Amino acid sequence: MDNLNDAQKQAIVHKDGPMMVLAGPGSGKTTVITKRTKYLVEKHGVNPRNILVITFTKAAAREMKERFEQLMKGECQVTFGTFHSVFFYILKQAYHFTAANIIREETKKAYIKESIDRLNLEVEDEADFISNIIGEISLVKSEMLPIEHYYSTNCAEEIFIQIYKEYDQRLRRNQLIDFDDMLVYCYELLSQRSDILAMWQNYYQYILIDEFQDINK
């Protein structure tokens, strides 16, 4: 660790309890996370299976895993993933979901179009309208906003509520989930089932999150 500054070393050798590392772009955050993970395994004797490293994109997770394996000179059993991949893994264990349960983008658009046609909506650009509505549905879900208190910028309030409810009903009827459902379902599962929460807390005893400041809740 000779090439690291004092703040980086402090973050790496920290063992138990929460720690937030604030640093700008290019300051070595990925280096700190990978070397801290290595330090937990080699110096503190932590089982690699009990370490979870989360980042926002698949590419970032893959890069971090590769850099860590270079440090360890081989594969290791630390879990690297995105929020969505980790939460979907938890849901798979609880509800036996598979990739077939994840809605495809074209199916999502088709569901919204069904509502447009059923409600006889006249829109100037249907493709843009569908895309915008999908974005608003995602916002409502990911922020866990009460649908009755959300005001759409694309259509009347009662129309948006109707489209939202029909979309959600079609998902459930066809046993499908979207990416925002992964977050919400996992949150609800761990909030309502203390036994399942305790199981995952025991399994992932050390959780390292890259770009933690970008999370919403």
Please report, for each region that a protein language model flagged, where it lies by residue.
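Residues at helix-coil transition
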Residues: 42, 92, 117, 172, ...
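The DHp (HisKA) dimerization/phosphotransfer helix of two-component histidine kinases
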Residues: 39, 139, 188-189
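Alpha-helical structural elements of signaling/regulatory helical domains
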Residues: 46, 125, 192-195
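Conserved helicase NTPase motor core
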Residues: 2-13, 17-21, 52, 79, ...
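Residue-level signature of catalytic and energy-coupling elements of molecular machines
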Residues: 8, 57, 82, 112, ...
